[in-house]
């Protein structure tokens, strides 16, 4: 596949809107408002997509400018902090490869059974031979990413997250929550944070902005091993891998799902973040959060959005 080159286009993303403000807050509010320009076609696609998932938070942002084009449940999207699950894997893999801390061809065996601390994190992918980086991202192999994360220090993990803007305000809303990140102290805690199940909670705007940042980084360095590996893994994931439901909308997409529950346990919530059309100069970043469900459910919402979007050819 072709690496991501010169991506522009759209991104799905959440935003909360403030009430009366003054001074610096007024300036920030004006800046935020300038980033909101509703595109009727994308708004219609969002509304069609959530008919069967009325609690979904779905946001569409232009990737090049960051302009918000369409959304649903903006305020909740900006205020809801949740464990991100496997959606962190692309950013962490890219950082590890780009910084020379990991070899893309290193293979890790997976028995599909994994326990880290008190968490049982068994893989749901098919039985497979030891995987390299591209394959592990395609199938979201927890054993592989636990092994990778185990080589990172707490400081390096924080650096990987900060490079994508995951631990800071996005500036997309005046009343947004900021990621809750608990500094890991042990190897297990680093692994759990990297797998998105403990020690970190983020919002949909933060996650969408992180993928927008990652897309821009890969577009700026299209020939690197890091870009070729991560872009291929994301495309494979949304084509035939764990995020395959996203491709049902008839638009080529590269993306990642995440399924997680609160640190205390309980019902799962689902995420999907995708870039569409995959491998094209005109790109949409699709971010969906379901407060109840799985990543595959969120990917299905994204596929319905893309099926009704301006990207779908008649």
Language-model features, listed with the residues they occupy:
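Bacterial N-terminal signal peptides that target proteins for export
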Residues: 1-11
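Conserved catalytic neighborhood of penicillin-recognizing serine enzymes
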Residues: 102-158, 166-170, 187-195
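A penicillin-recognizing enzyme superfamily signal
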Residues: 40, 143-146, 150-158, 187-309
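Active-site SXXK
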Residues: 46, 66, 81-108, 136, ...
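Beta-lactamase-like hydrolase cores
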Residues: 28-64, 70-71
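Glycine-rich, acidic and aromatic/proline-enriched surface loops and short helix-turn segments
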Residues: 51-55, 61-71, 97-102, 113, ...
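Bacterial N-terminal signal peptides
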Residues: 10-20
